Amino acid sequence: MSHRLVYSIPLREDEEIQMSLKEFKGNMYCDMRVYFNAKDQDLKLPSKKGLTLKIDLLDPLLEGLTKVKQALTSSDVLLETEA
């Protein structure tokens, strides 16, 4: 399995979201996963928190994220917190 880190988003000092491309059994995937610092090591380890998608789902994902962003900035959307 090949793996190529493409982008990372810092969350906290000891955590980040890593976005990478992976090849597995001849198929390409986009993996978005939270990584954390291993204790007493200079190493980041993957957590169970993440998402792995086939490459053909990237465009629908981007479309959905765009709609979420538009909804957040739209005046007709009211976000409620659970009581």
Which residues fall in each region the model found?
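Negatively charged, low-complexity tracts enriched in Asp/Glu with abundant Ser/Thr
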Residues: 1-12
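Mixed-charge, Lys/Arg-enriched low-complexity segments
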Residues: 55-83
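A short, structured beta-strand/loop element
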Residues: 17-49
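Beta-strand-rich receptor-binding modules of extracellular spikes/adhesins
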Residues: 44-60
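Intrinsic disorder/low-complexity signal
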Residues: 12-15, 30, 41, 75, ...
